Every structure is written in structure tokens, then in C-alpha cells.
Amino acid sequence: MARTTAHITLLSDLTPPSQERTWLTAPHPTLPIVATCSSDKTVRVYSLSNFRLLSTITGGHKRSVRTCAWKPHVQGESVLATGSFDATVGIWRRWDSYGLLSSDHTTAAAASEDADSDSDEWRFAVLLDGHDSEVKSVSWSASGMLLATCARDKSIWIWEDLDDGDNNFETVAVMQEHEGDVKCVAWHPAEECLASGSYDDTIRLWREDLDDWGQVACLKGHGGTVWFVDWEGVENVPAGLQGEEGKWKESRALSGPRLASCSDDRTVRIWRRVPKEQLQQQQAGTPFGGTGIPSIIRPTGTDETWEEEAVLPKMHELPVYAVAWSKRTGLLASVGADGRLVLYEERFVDGSAQAMDTDGPASAPLSTEWVAVGVVEGAHGIYEINHVAWAKRADRGREEGKDEEVLITTADDGSVKVWTVR
């Protein structure tokens, strides 16, 4: 059932905060901990059980740590990739209770409590050197075998973790099609498909074809730098729903997870891949298969067609720096230079779900719209907010038996705040 408004309430700050700008906070994929990147050249690891600092990772980078990402599917240890303005990428490892992969949230929370002050146990395993200037974003693939990095040098690098016990990584691709600073990279939640956003105002999608990585789509629509992209969760489109809404969602699922983006143009947009089946239907019976050009010069079979599905309500007065798509509820959050935290919900347009004629197809096709359901003004006072992320709630205030989420915002004042959404 659609909500009319959402109540976004401050739960806690993560303490102690950094005394310098913080860029991004990455929730661990399985444990109630997060890693926060700071301009003071460190990464701080906090507990989401008691909101206290567990470790400070130092000594690996010579300039600001701009980005970090936890490697998924690791047993017995935690592995963190960091990207810095010193143009390098670091891989850090820690053999301890951080690495307990437990479905029992209580056990995981206790594990995070045990890992208190031994920051020296973080091992700087390897330095990945290749970029010519500031690294802006790092992202692990869903399998955990590939690491994507991007930088101000306009390039995207893909590294393979050889997982040979010697911390060896191999460069498998360097893509340089972007015409400006590459601000972000994000892997598809289930496939080896990479999305990137850039100062050139475009979003590009990349896949491997015959051992060669290349661009399969270039999404144009933003009128400014694309600061951040985030994928929809695979489970956001549930199967087995009844009625016309169920049919509509199953049809949309053919496109796979959608992509959200935000920009200097103050907008948040949603992009959808057009399924090949739909393209074939559109092209049937038209010259040259609907492309208007002979097949000999048509794009290759690996190319994909993406379309802008929605522009969300304009809620920001300044550039939007980050978006976060809840993999559990489908809610979308955005933050930016105006200090606002905004929450959006996708709904069926009034009446469209009841527009079915009993004897035939819908008189008005089902459609959805995005509605802003919550806003926090000045979430970090006068400071710009650089990042937002969803995480599983882990503190003692959560409702027993409920799988709650929290929002985590990271800002220029060095603070990281945790919010509940009801």
C-alpha cells in the first residue's frame, strides 16, 4: 500500500566523527558495520549496533580517500577496496570477527562489538597503480571477482582478483570512451554489466564480448555532470503477483533491474533497458528491420537500447550528489549540495490499475509515477551531503522480528548520520 508521507527521523550520529570532510559510507554486505572515507587520508569503520568507531584504517594513501567498497562473498575475513586522490587503489584485509558470515544477526552484532581497537590488524594487502589522477569510485562485481575503478583521467579500469592467496590482481580492461572525469562506477546486481557516470553528462554501460570489454550503450539526457548511479535490486520486481499489476510487473521484469542517476542538473532520473523482444516487435514489418539502415552498418548484436523512463519530482535546488535505491522496499533516496535528504516512492498512477475492461485489454495502460514522500531540510546543518546509502538496521531499538532498514548520510562537516524511515 502506498504511503502518503514517510517519517525520516535521526537515530544517531556515528561517533567520533572525522574532523575533515567525509565522502562516502559503505555498508558491509553481511555484517552490521560500515566504512567511511575521509579527506584526512583514513577510512573509519563503525558499528551499526552501537554507532561507535571500531577501527581507523591509516597509512595506505597520501591524499584524501574518496571512495571504498566491500568485497562480497568473502569467508573468514573482510576485504575493502579504497580509492584515493593520490591516484591509487588499495586493497585491505582483516582476519577477525569482521569476517564472520552469519545469518544470525545477533551473532554478527556481537562480532562487531568484539572488534574494538585493533586497527593495526588491517593489512594493506596490495596497491593497484594505473590511473593518472584522482580515483573517484570503486565497485566490486556481484561475484566479487572483478573490481572496477574510475578516475579524473577519463578512464575506467577493470581488475580481476586472481584469488591465488598472493593478493594478485590482473588488469583485464581499460576503457577510455568517456570525454570527461569519470565520477562513478556501479556493477549490475546480478550480471557482469558495469554502469559509469561522467563529467561529460553521459551514463555508459559496459559488457564483455569475446574477451574484450566494450561500451554497449550511452545514455544521454542529463544536462550536467552525472555524479552517481545506483541499480535497482533484482528482488524489487517480485514474481507471482496476481492481476494486472502482477502482469505489468512481470512484463517490466524482462528489462531487468533499472538504473537511477543523479546530476549537476539537479535531477534524478530512471533508465530502463528495452528488452530485445520488445525491440523485435517494434521493428517487425519495417524496412531494414526497423533501424532504417542496412544491416551491414547496423550496431553490433551486443549493443543495448536503453530509454529514460522517468524524471523524478524536482526536489533539489542545487546539484544532486548521490542516490540510493533500497533493494528491500524499492524506495529511492537522494542527497546533494542543498543539504536535503529526499525520499521517493514509485506508485501506480491513480485509476490505471482499475482501467481494465472485463472483455479486453486495458482502456488505459498501467503506468507508474514517482512521488516525493519525505524531505529533511538541512540534514547536516549548512553542509553539503556527499553520499547516501541503505543498510540493515542493527541497533537494539529495532522492532523484534522486523527486517528494518536505515539510511546513512555522509557530509562535508565530517559527520555520518543514521536515519530511520517509517
Swiss-Prot record:
Key word Hydrolase present: no
UniProt record, GO biological process: iron-sulfur cluster assembly
Function of the molecule: Essential component of the cytosolic iron-sulfur (Fe/S) protein assembly machinery. Required for the maturation of extramitochondrial Fe/S proteins.
Name recorded for this polypeptide: Probable cytosolic iron-sulfur protein assembly protein 1
Source organism of this protein record: Aspergillus terreus (strain NIH 2624 / FGSC A1156)
Gene: cia1
Cellular component GO terms, alphabetical: cytosolic [4Fe-4S] assembly targeting complex
Entry keyword set: Repeat, WD repeat
InterPro entries: CIAO1/Cia1, G-protein_beta_WD-40_rep, WD40/YVTN_repeat-like_dom_sf, WD40_repeat_dom_sf, WD40_rpt
